[in-house]
């Protein structure tokens, strides 16, 4: 993904303020609620029977935290997303058999969560830069599928 210096500054500047644990839990939780078919990849997580069950589920929160920490590695390596996510791409493709479309969905949900957390600070240029990043990460995670 090609980002201008200004776009990189938008992303890294805001990312420094992101509470990865909180935002990760909310983004993954929202994904599982809004797109319930994604729950099939999380059978071992226990009760996902309602929105409140999903949002309060400790395993959802823990995995969301893990996802956002990985995304943070991507933000730190914006010029090498494919390399940064190569092992995760392999894991999700070969072992977990996750539909790569889910990476795009999660990226879009993440942008919504960031917008809700940061309000006016999440300006149109910041949103546009984050959309590029989440699209680049989704492509990097889907790389092994091609």
Swiss-Prot record:
Disulfide pairings: none
Domain spans labelled Globin: 2-146
A Pfam cross-reference name: Globin
GO MF, any single term: haptoglobin binding
A single cellular component GO annotation: haptoglobin-hemoglobin complex
Family: Belongs to the globin family.
Stated name of the protein: Hemoglobin subunit beta
Record organism: Suncus murinus
Lineage per the UniProt record: Eukaryota, Metazoa, Chordata, Craniata, Vertebrata
